[in-house]
Amino acid sequence: ENYVEAAHTFRNRPDLWKKIEEGALSSNAAMREGTQHMLSTFKKNPKKYTPENIEHIDMKFGKALDDICPNCRYDVKFREGQKPLFEEFKSYNSETWSKIANDKGFIKQFESYLQEVNKLEDLAYMINSNKANINEVKQAFKELFKKEADNLFRFPEEGGLGLEKIRKLFGRDIKNTSDFLDKAEDINNPIYNFIKTN
C-alpha cells in the first residue's frame, strides 16, 4: 500500500511532516509499522485527517510491552471541537492485546487519557484490524476494567478517576464498582465504543 500520498497532505505543516517522516524512516520496526497503520487510516478518511483538523502528532515509543509508550502521549491530537479529540493508534497482535490488563505502562497511558477527556467520545483507540479482531480487543479491555475497577474508583487525589468522572465517561447510572463491572461484562456495551478499527 502506498502511504506517500497521505503523508504528502502534511507537507505544509512541517511539525506534523517531521513526525510522520521520523516514524516512517525509523530503525524501530514497531514504530514504522505504527506509522503505516496511522497513514493507512489517514488515507481511508482524508476529510477527517486534514492538516487543519490536527493539532499535533506525537509517536513516542519506549521499552515496554510491544513498545507501549511509557510517557503517555497521544498519537494524534485534534483541534478543540473535533471528535474525537485524541486518537491512539495500536498495531498490536492478539497476543499482545491479551496482556494489556497486566501491563502497568498501558494502564497508566489509558488512565491518563481518561483523566484528560470529558466525554468518552473524545477518545478513540484505532486498532489494526489486520493484526487483531475488535472483539479480542474489547475482551482485553474487559479484563483491564475488571482488574482496575477499584483503582479507577479511587479519588483523583489518590490516583483514580473518582465516581463523578466515571459517571461522566461511562454512564450516569453507575453508582458503584459493581454497576461499572456489570456494564463492562458485555463487550457490546457502549462503554467499549472508543475501540475502533481502521
For the regions a language model picked out, list residue spans one by one.
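Acidic-basic catalytic patches of nuclease active cores, encompassing PD-(D/E)XK
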Residues: 2-68
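Surface-exposed polar/charged interaction patches
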Residues: 6-13, 22-27, 41-45, 116, ...
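Alpha-helix boundary/N-cap detector
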Residues: 8-11, 15, 26-29, 33, ...
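Short glycine-rich, low-complexity/disordered patches
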Residues: 47-60, 122-131, 152-161
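Short secondary-structure capping micro-motifs at structural edges
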Residues: 62-66, 74-75, 110-114
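Active-site beta-strand-loop-beta-strand hairpin of nuclease catalytic cores
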Residues: 66-89
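Catalytic cores of nucleic-acid endonucleases
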Residues: 83-84, 89-154
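Non-catalytic C-terminal interaction segments of nucleic acid-processing enzymes
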Residues: 147-198
